[in-house]
């Protein structure tokens, strides 16, 4: 006779602990590194709470509650630093700022609550297919969080695997696919540990065979080499870079008498004295609109880079009251002349860069400058320089791999180097810096493109195409990071021009992952109907 499920008073604290462990796995608070094994352990704990025995699964409504507690703890302890931007820099009262973080975490956790409830409603009790369904439900929740209501996928479980064995999957299925595989493996481990899988070696072989067939189909259909190593006779040119980190205090950054003057003086001098082929200054390094700058300031920089063998990318707000404002990157080089290259940010930060409908009352209580930008398009042109195609992205835009992937629709014009310009100073000296670094590393793995990062306070770094940090500047210091970066994919006809992930995400976005998850759900519902018919 099956035993009753454990009480909620016992399950919910463990769900809370598992959620906290999931958050810590993304960037360990005492070192900043991702811990893939801790993420798997936290997922295994969640799976065990949902299926406490070989012949027992919790009721769907209890599963939803467990999943909601797990996800709320995970998300709130992942982006708790939003409190700093709202309270310290936005002057929002501390209780209201803390409540806002918790409400956001609980709202996003509702996707996981629904997914876990659906899993326990549909999953078979004795089959390894339950692991497949668990991975599919987890994938649906991650996709919903990353896509709906502008999307906020910060802290997705797959980022914990930037250094783990599952990192090899990034070039095929991206961070969401890695998270789904981790969920599948977590439930398989739980079932294997208690002998719930009567024929588990056969199931694992079937899963491995299906994965191999899928990869072979991708290689044949897309004409993409699945090997990461480039041909030995092919070597892309090296680009020397200088990445500027001004470390302008966030509470001074937009004050005319202090931070603004310091930023204009320091960045102006650094941009003029740099010697590298490419110089990058971070997001809003120049914290004034062009028409607010002292006469000749921007024109002087443009003339400097028009005369020498150098180029610069620098962050600056752009526009006017008539046309609207954008958070932009300006590109200066001998080729641009009087018409500099410009990239405008597409994925704006809710409440910080635009006001969502019905929330003006909330943003009115905060004192955040530059808070109402226009949104630009996806897939903007790259900045061509020194034989490279440089693709800027601003702030947390590198969180959305599907949007970066839009630039890979034509391999001949695909980026060879990603350039991230950020200002994480809004969130203080917190784990947000390390989390953002892991996000950039995952993008480098997915597209096999190096990522250079110029930030106000950190992490200013150079990441190679294998996701390894090769150079990094000390956080919260003022300085210049010098290094070399090797662009990738200059030859559009070589087998390693783009990864499988870049190929399919450029064409269909995240829809293939949505479709795979939906197919798994359809299979589970059909299997459930068949079981009920046999029972009748």
From Swiss-Prot:
The keyword Transmembrane helix applies. Residues 244-487 form the CN hydrolase domain. It is found in: Cell inner membrane. Disulfide bonds: none annotated. GO terms for molecular function: N-acyltransferase activity. One of its GO terms (cellular component) is plasma membrane. It comes from the Bacteria. Its EC number is 2.3.1.269. Pathway: Protein modification; lipoprotein biosynthesis (N-acyl transfer). GO terms for biological process: lipoprotein biosynthetic process. The active site is at 283 (proton acceptor), 345, 395 (nucleophile). InterPro entries: Apolipo_AcylTrfase, C-N_Hydrolase, C-N_Hydrolase_sf, LNT_N. Its main location: membrane. It is a multi-pass membrane protein. Catalyzes the phospholipid dependent N-acylation of the N-terminal cysteine of apolipoprotein, the last step in lipoprotein maturation. PANTHER family: APOLIPOPROTEIN N-ACYLTRANSFERASE. Belongs to the CN hydrolase family. Apolipoprotein N-acyltransferase subfamily. This is Apolipoprotein N-acyltransferase.
């Amino acid at each position: 006779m099956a035993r009753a499920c454990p009480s909620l008073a016992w399950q919910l604290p463990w769900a809370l602990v598992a959620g906290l462990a999931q958050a810590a796995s993304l960037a360990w608070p005492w070192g900043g590194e991702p811990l893939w094994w801790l993420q798997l352990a936290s997922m295994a704990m969640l799976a065990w709470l949902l299926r406490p025995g070989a012949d027992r699964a919790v009721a769907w409504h209890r599963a939803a509650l467990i999943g909601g507690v797990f996800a709320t703890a995970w998300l709130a302890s992942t982006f708790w630093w939003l409190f700093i931007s709202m309270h310290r820099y936005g002057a929002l009262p501390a209780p209201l700022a803390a409540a806002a973080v918790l409400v956001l975490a609980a709202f996003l956790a509702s996707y996981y609550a629904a997914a876990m409830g659906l899993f326990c409603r549909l999953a078979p009790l004795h089959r390894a297919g339950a692991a497949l369904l668990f991975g599919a439900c987890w994938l649906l929740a991650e996709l919903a969080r990353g896509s709906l209501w502008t999307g906020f996928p910060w802290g997705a479980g797959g980022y914990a695997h930037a250094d783990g064995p599952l990192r090899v999957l990034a070039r095929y299925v991206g961070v969401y696919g890695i998270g789904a595989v981790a969920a599948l493996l977590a439930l398989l481990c739980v079932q294997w540990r208690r002998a719930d899988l009567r024929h588990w070696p056969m199931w694992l072989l079937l899963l491995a065979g299906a994965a191999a067939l899928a990869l072979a189909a991708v290689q044949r259909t897309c004409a993409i080499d699945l090997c990461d190593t480039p041909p030995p006779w092919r070597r892309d040119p090296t680009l020397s870079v200088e990445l500027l980190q001004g470390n302008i205090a966030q509470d001074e950054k937009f004050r005319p008498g202090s931070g603004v003057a310091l930023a204009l003086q320091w960045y102006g001098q650094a941009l003029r004295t740099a010697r590298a082929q490419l110089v990058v200054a971070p997001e809003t390094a120049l914290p004034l609109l062009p028409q607010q700058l002292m006469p000749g300031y921007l024109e002087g920089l443009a003339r400097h880079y028009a005369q020498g063998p150098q180029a610069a990318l620098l962050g600056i707000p752009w526009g006017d009251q008539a046309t609207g404002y954008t958070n932009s990157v300006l590109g200066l080089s001998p080729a641009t002349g009087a018409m500099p290259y410009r990239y405008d940010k597409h994925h704006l930060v809710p409440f910080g860069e635009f006001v969502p409908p019905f929330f003006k009352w909330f943003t009115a209580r905060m004192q955040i400058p530059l808070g109402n930008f226009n949104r630009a398009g996806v897939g903007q042109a790259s900045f061509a320089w020194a034989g490279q195609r440089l693709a800027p992205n601003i702030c947390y835009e590198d969180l959305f791999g599907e949007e970066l992937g839009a630039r890979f629709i034509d391999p001949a014009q695909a980026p060879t180097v990603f350039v991230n310009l950020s200002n994480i100073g809004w969130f203080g000296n917190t784990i947000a810096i390390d989390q953002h670094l892991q996000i950039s590393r995952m993008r480098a793995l997915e597209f096999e493109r190096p990522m250079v990062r110029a930030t106000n306070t950190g992490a200013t770094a150079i990441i190679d195409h294998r996701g390894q940090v090769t150079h990094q500047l000390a956080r919260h210091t003022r300085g210049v990071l010098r290094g070399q970066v090797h662009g990738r994919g200059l030859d559009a006809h070589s087998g390693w021009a783009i990864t499988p992930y870049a190929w399919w995400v450029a064409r269909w976005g995240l829809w293939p992952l949505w479709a795979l998850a939906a197919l798994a759900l359809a299979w589970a519902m059909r299997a459930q109907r068949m079981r009920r018919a046999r029972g009748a």
